[in-house]
Amino acid sequence: MEKLSSKDKELIRGSWDSLGKNKVPHGVILFSRLFELDPELLNLFHYTTNCGSTQDCLSSPEFLEHVTKVMLVIDAAVSHLDDLHSLEDFLLNLGRKHQAVGVKPQSFAMVGESLLYMLQCSLGQAYTASLRQAWLNMYSVVVASMSRGWAKNGEDKAD
């Protein structure tokens, strides 16, 4: 697992201080953007409230629980910036779960774009090129682990 620079960690922690306190509203921005980028992803969410539209999903308590979980994963990554390796097993398992429900590997890139969009919308002028790069660096480490779990789960199913 790659290590993040001290500057990356400082930028990520500083920006997450305010965002992490209001996870759901920021997560809603992230998922709204994700569904704009790929509306087909709505089909992966099967709750008592059908997610036929972005608005249906975003008003579903079950989906908002999923939003909270995603934001908690980001929170965990930020909390473990000094030792992202400690999250390896968790992230591998998360990748397996996403493969099992039909998430495609290219969707991870769209989630990354959506994360950056949320950061830009939420941070305004505090969103700088170096901050963007720091978050990209962290996200690439997280997604690399999830992708390994995704691929491993696919191999297990093929056997």
From Swiss-Prot:
Query: PROSITE patterns, per this entry?
Result: GLOBIN (PS01033)
Q: Does the keyword ATP-binding apply?
A: no
Record's subcellular location: Cytoplasm, Cytosol; Mitochondrion matrix
Q: Note one Pfam family from the annotation.
A: Globin
A single Gene Ontology biological process assigned to it is: cellular response to hypoxia
Q: Which reaction equation describes what this protein catalyses? A: Fe(III)-heme b-[protein] + nitric oxide + H2O = Fe(II)-heme b-[protein] + nitrite + 2 H(+)
An annotated Gene Ontology molecular function:
nitrite reductase activity
> Keywords assigned by UniProt?
Cytoplasm, Heme, Iron, Metal-binding, Mitochondrion, Oxidoreductase
Gene Ontology CC: cytosol; mitochondrial matrix
Q: Write the Enzyme Commission number(s) for this entry.
A: 1.7.-.-
Give the PANTHER family listed for this entry: BLR2807 PROTEIN, NEUROGLOBIN
Q: What is this protein called?
A: Neuroglobin
> Which organism does this record belong to?
Tetraodon nigroviridis
> Corresponding gene?
ngb
